[in-house]
């Protein structure tokens, strides 16, 4: 969904949340929550790998609270992404 200058992507996360905001003009991306690990593996990871190929990055990652349906996908992303100086999936600005 695009609203003016913002693209909003809501990944399927069952009872959790996994939302990516892309401010198009500024080319700034915010990931809010990561859903369950299955959300990350099935939807978020493939999307991040695709946009990373074109040089995109996550400028900010926000975890709203530590319930597993909000944080487990983020935990898996951070585990798999590795060192921030040499990310395996996507560059992340701030968490």
What residue ranges belong to the model's regions?
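Conserved beta-strand hairpin/beta-sheet module of binuclear metal-dependent hydrolase folds
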Residues: 2-57
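Active-site metal-binding motif and surrounding structural segment of the metallo-beta-lactamase
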Residues: 41-95
């Amino acid at each position: 969904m695009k609203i003016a200058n913002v693209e909003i992507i809501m990944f399927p996360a069952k009872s959790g949340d996994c939302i990516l905001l892309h401010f198009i003009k500024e080319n700034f991306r915010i990931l809010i929550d990561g859903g369950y690990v299955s959300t990350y593996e099935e939807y978020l990871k493939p999307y991040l790998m695709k946009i990373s190929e074109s040089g995109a990055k996550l400028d900010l990652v926000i975890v709203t609270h530590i319930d597993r349906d909000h944080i487990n996908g983020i935990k898996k992303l951070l585990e798999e992404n590795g060192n921030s100086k040499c990310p395996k999936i996507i560059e992340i600005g701030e968490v």
